[in-house]
């Protein structure tokens, strides 16, 4: 009983929801054997004829190529393309390809030499002795991709299946109207197709192998049954004709009763599907050693005089194939690549044949009927009834028109197989498939942009983390590479620390002085003397660093002399205007005298420290002499006009005498330091000597006429002198600081 149920289930088929039954229109071509087409003069081979990235070019312009020679390198999911014939590479440039957008893609353009020479072919007749990995790599490097329309790399698909494939399905349904490429291939090359199926089974090691074929192909069914007559490992399943039974998910459900989950793949349920044409290409790649350079293409439509199926070289322009079949275009002729439901209109006929090209349809105006204008949706739900994937095309249509990408994704627009059944039954003639294609392309672009943004964010975060790590490493390296003191430096540091500790200990100890003893200030005195010595050494060092050849500024000396003269004039005016009865404070007079003496000594030191090379400007000396003579005359006039009873203050007289002596010494030193070549006017010298003698006599008379009774307090004079010395010392230190 169990065996009976197993046998019943083994031959059981399931039916999917939806689907349509359009006119088949296959009789135009399925009765004509396969034929070859004359070679074209130019071939355009796009680098990307599959799902995935294009390969890396390995030829250059001007290279000679042979048929089957790789034009690109296939790495990872990149599938290589091969030269369809022998010739010369004339260009590598963008060219429009077989795509609904007709966008230009990078292509290799070859001029055929007409010889059609192959590369050396190395076939693996005993393929069973090869490992699974070797077979998959050979299939991949020979450019085999899904020839049913998807174009997925076959090697990658076999590698992804692994050991979890239990059922291998060969899709021979070919359900779309007009297309008979697989039908004719099975009629003419059934043995090679079965041999390719056995190679795939050897790689995957499935539990069962199923061939699904529609019942509208009786000749192909009979040829396959004849080849499989003595075989028990491959089962041929004939299914009812219904569109789209050839869809991967639909055929999987029909043969196994299993449904592929949303967003999943057939390998998730242990099923792997390959096309009949793909199995034939695998046989030629493994056993014959021939890369895929041609495929079967159906040329059909009432605009073609000789419809049929031909072996078309990849890269052959569509125009060349149509002309070979007797193409008779009308005024508004349309050429469709693919079937009438899933195909797309070509913008021009220079598009090349690629791996996924299975049909070229050139219908007449009678076949297409009158074009009908798109109308508004009437919500009849006919599209939902016809959908084989149980979607809601009406809702997806509104979401696509409204750019509501999230809602379209939620309603599983990605599961749409673009079969065109919804558009076929739509009474409003709405091209639903075009809307869905555009919406899926926009969603894919948005996801690609989001992926790029996420990758950029990840790169930025990784960069920030790397910078933080480098910063932490750098700080750690700086800490570890800090300067370590040498042995002698350590000793010095230890000694300094010991001295500091000793001083701190001494500072914390209380100072006790016995009665009758004086405190020991020797340390403080020594420190003070050390600071003084350090200051003197610093001053000496500063004096030594000065350049010996530097000439002292005469302007500074002149300014000091002018200040002294100004003070002298001011003092004389004060004396002349003073009242006879005005008494001067003797303490102030003593202080002024001390200040005058300090200034005089400071001036003498500056003159004594002046460099011997210092030169005195004779013009300035003459000016100073004239000023001195004017002062002398003014003083004589003041003395002549003074009252005989006026008493001169001896303190002021002493100050004036000191100033006069300082000026006299300054003048003598300037004359002594003058150049020996410089001659002094004798008349001026005599005048200056006379003035000096007059001042001296005047001073003597003033001192003689001074009151004998007036005595200066010696204590006050001493205090004034001390103050004067302190101020003089402070002025000297300030000068040193200013010079520094």
From Swiss-Prot:
InterPro entries per UniProt: 4Fe4S_Fe-S-bd, 4Fe4S_Fe_S_CS, Ion_transpt_RnfC/RsxC, Nuo51_FMN-bd, Nuo51_FMN-bd_sf, RnfC_N, Soluble_ligand-bd
Protein name: Ion-translocating oxidoreductase complex subunit C
Organism: Shigella flexneri
Assigned GO CC terms: plasma membrane
Residues covered by the 4Fe-4S ferredoxin-type domain: 369-397, 407-436
Gene3D superfamilies with a match to the protein in the record: 3.30.70.20, NADH-ubiquinone oxidoreductase 51kDa subunit
Protein EC: 7.-.-.-
Keyword 4Fe-4S: yes
């Amino acid at each position: 009983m169990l065996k009976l149920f197993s046998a019943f289930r083994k031959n059981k088929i399931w039916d999917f929801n939806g689907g349509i039954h359009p006119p088949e229109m296959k009789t135009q071509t399925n009765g004509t054997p396969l034929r070859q087409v004359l070679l074209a003069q130019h071939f355009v081979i796009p680098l990307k004829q599959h799902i995935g990235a294009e390969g890396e070019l390995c030829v250059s312009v001007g290279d000679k190529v042979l048929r089957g020679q790789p034009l690109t390198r296939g790495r990872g999911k990149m599938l290589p393309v091969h030269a369809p014939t022998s010739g010369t590479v004339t260009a590598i440039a963008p060219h429009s390809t077989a795509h609904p957008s007709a966008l230009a893609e990078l292509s290799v353009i070859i001029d055929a030499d007409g010889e059609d020479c192959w590369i050396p072919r190395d076939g693996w007749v005993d393929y069973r002795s090869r490992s699974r990995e070797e077979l998959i790599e050979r299939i991949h490097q020979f450019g085999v991709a899904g020839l049913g329309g998807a174009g997925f790399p076959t090697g990658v698909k076999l590698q992804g299946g692994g050991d979890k494939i239990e059922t291998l399905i060969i899709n021979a349904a070919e359900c779309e109207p007009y297309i008979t490429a697989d039908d004719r291939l099975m009629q003419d090359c059934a043995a090679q197709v079965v041999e390719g199926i056995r190679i795939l089974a050897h790689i995957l090691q499935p539990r069962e192998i199923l061939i699904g074929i529609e019942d509208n192909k009786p000749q192909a069914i009979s040829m396959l049954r004849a080849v499989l007559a003595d075989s028990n490992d491959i089962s041929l399943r004939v299914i009812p004709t219904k569109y789209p039974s050839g869809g991967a998910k639909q055929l999987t459900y029909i043969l196994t009763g299993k449904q592929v989950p949303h967003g999943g793949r057939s390998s998730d349920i242990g099923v792997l599907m390959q096309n009949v044409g793909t199995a034939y290409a695998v046989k030629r790649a493994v056993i014959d050693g021939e890369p895929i350079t041609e495929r079967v293409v159906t040329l059909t439509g009432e605009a073609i005089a000789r419809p049929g199926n031909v072996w078309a070289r990849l890269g052959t322009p569509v125009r060349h194939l149509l002309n070979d079949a007797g193409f008779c275009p009308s005024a508004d002729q349309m050429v469709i690549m693919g079937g009438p439901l899933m195909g797309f209109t070509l913008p021009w006929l220079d598009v090349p044949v690629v791996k996924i090209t299975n049909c070229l349809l050139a219908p007449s105006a009678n076949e297409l009927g009158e074009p009908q204008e798109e109308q508004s949706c009437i919500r009849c739900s006919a599209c939902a009834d016809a959908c084989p994937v149980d979607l809601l095309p009406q809702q997806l249509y509104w979401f696509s028109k409204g750019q509501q990408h999230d809602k379209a994704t939620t309603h599983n627009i990605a599961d749409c197989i673009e079969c065109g059944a919804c558009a076929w039954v739509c009474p409003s003639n709405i091209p639903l498939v075009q809307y869905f294609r555009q919406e899926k392309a926009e969603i894919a672009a948005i996801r690609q942009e989001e992926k790029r943004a996420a990758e950029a964010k990840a790169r930025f975060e990784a960069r920030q983390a790397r910078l933080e790590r480098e910063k932490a490493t750098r700080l750690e390296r700086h800490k570890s590479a800090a300067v370590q003191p040498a042995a002698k430096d350590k000793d010095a540091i230890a000694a300094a620390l010991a001295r500091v500790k000793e001083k701190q200990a001494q500072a914390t100890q209380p100072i006790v002085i016995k009665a009758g003893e004086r405190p020991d200030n020797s340390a403080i005195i020594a420190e003070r003397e050390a600071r003084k010595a350090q200051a003197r050494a610093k001053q000496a060092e500063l004096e030594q660093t000065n350049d010996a050849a530097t000439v002292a500024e005469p302007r500074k000396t002149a300014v000091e002399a002018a200040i002294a003269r100004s003070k002298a004039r001011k003092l004389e005016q004060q004396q002349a205007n003073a009242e006879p009865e005005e008494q001067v404070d003797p303490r102030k007079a003593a202080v002024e005298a001390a200040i005058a003496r300090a200034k005089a000594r400071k001036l003498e030191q500056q003159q004594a420290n002046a460099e011997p090379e210092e030169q005195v400007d004779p013009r300035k000396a003459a000016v100073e002499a004239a000023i001195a003579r004017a002062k002398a005359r003014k003083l004589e006039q003041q003395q002549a006009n003074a009252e005989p009873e006026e008493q001169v203050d001896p303190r002021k007289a002493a100050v004036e005498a000191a100033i006069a002596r300082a000026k006299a010494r300054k003048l003598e030193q300037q004359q002594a330091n003058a150049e020996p070549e410089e001659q002094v006017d004798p008349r001026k010298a005599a005048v200056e000597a006379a003035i000096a003698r007059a001042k001296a006599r005047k001073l003597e008379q003033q001192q003689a006429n001074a009151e004998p009774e007036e005595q200066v307090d010696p204590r006050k004079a001493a205090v004034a002198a001390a103050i004067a010395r302190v101020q003089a010392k402070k002025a000297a230190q300030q000068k040193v600081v200013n010079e520094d």
